[in-house]
Every structure is written in C-alpha cells, then in structure tokens.
Amino acid sequence: LEMLKRLPDEYVQMCVTSPPYYGLRDYGAEGQIGCEQTPLEYIDRLTEIFREVRRVLKSNGTLWLNIADSYAGSGKGVWSKSLAERPKSKQTYHSLNTDENAALPKKWDGIKEKDMIGIPWQLAFAHRADGWYLRSDIIWQKPNCLPEAVKDRPTKSYEHIFLLSKSPHYYYDTAAISEPVAPVTVERNKRAVSDRTKYAKGVGGAKPQALFLPRSHSDMPTKRNKRDVWSVSTNSHRGYGHFAMY
C-alpha cells in the first residue's frame, strides 16, 4: 500500500494480480495479507489497497483480480494445531499473535464450521460499492487441479478472475482475445438456408430461391467473443520460490 501511494495518479493502464487468499498460507512476514482475524478485516484491507490501485489506473484502465474462496475451520487437521505442530510443507495460517499456540479462528458470526466463507463475491461486491465497475466474473478452470482429502463435497477445480474497470467506458481489445469458432459451427454455416422451417419467414429481403444456395464464405465468422470460462493448467513453483504460480 505504501508503495502504491508513491505512484502518481492515472499512471498505469492495467493491473493483473492475485492477492494472498484468506487463511491459506503463512509467508512469515509481518503485516502480510491473508492473516487477518476475520474475513471482514481481510475484505476491508483489500478494498483499501485496490482503492489506491484505482487511483493509479488511467481513466480507461482495468483491474483483473484473481481470487479463490476459503472454508471456515472444522476444528480438525491443521486448523486446530499450533504453529509448531503444523506440517511445514503446508505453510498454513497462524495468527500474527506472538503466542506460538495461536490458531486461526474456527468460525465467525454468521459463518459455521465447514462453511464456504464466500470471499470472492464479498470482495467483488465490496469493490463495486467502493466505486469499481464490476464487469465480468471469469471462471478459471484448472484441468490439473490438486486433489483434496475430502469425502463430503466435490474437489475444488476453479477460481475467480474478476474484471473491474475504473470507468463505464474503458480499453478492452476484443479482437486480441477472440477465440476460433467451433468447427461444427463453421460447417453448419456453410449449409444452405431452407424455407421448410418455422424461421423461414424471418429471412427478410431474400429471394425464395436464394434461401437454398450455400452461404458466401465471406459471411462466415471465424472468430467469436471470448467466453468467461477459461481452462488453463497451473505451473509448478519449483525453482521460482513462489507457491501460487499462474
């Protein structure tokens, strides 16, 4: 936050970021994000940071915010263990309290043990209320998601990428991220149009015999607007010193 405050107004075009997720890891740094005692404190802190990001963005700039949800503790596993008892490979949460036995609170008002906290949408709504334009919720689907030792719910395999803008009109290059039209759609578009359907009368201005002719290749789109479910495999963090490669 302090570094952001040193940047001038409307300095950058776009911000792509993934802040530390709530209650997931302890990076061992004083004042780190994600170690707040309540989800509300976490949301408020990120809202304050991204308010400064909005100031730094150009008037037609955008923010692409990657975030995932967290679960309230069930009282089992590493959630209930002291720092000394937790497996180092997990790098899981512990309170910034100097007490080595301090653990993450297992529940909060309105959130029961084992509940999904709902961090992504709470954060999105907080940003919208703070002045951002909430434009899209992109689902990042992970084909190689990590397995989970759970028996009472599906394994998590996606995260959210929220597209937010500073203004109602902003720079967005649709063509740059357009995707190919499905081959089956291309083949279907090559076919002649028949008048033996309930939609035939809707073909205004066309001669009846023209409805049976194959369509011109120039009329067939080869690209379509990018969809909001993206299947992207994650990368290994080995050799990079970072636990959340994307």
Predicted region positions:
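Core catalytic lobe of class I
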Residues: 1-246
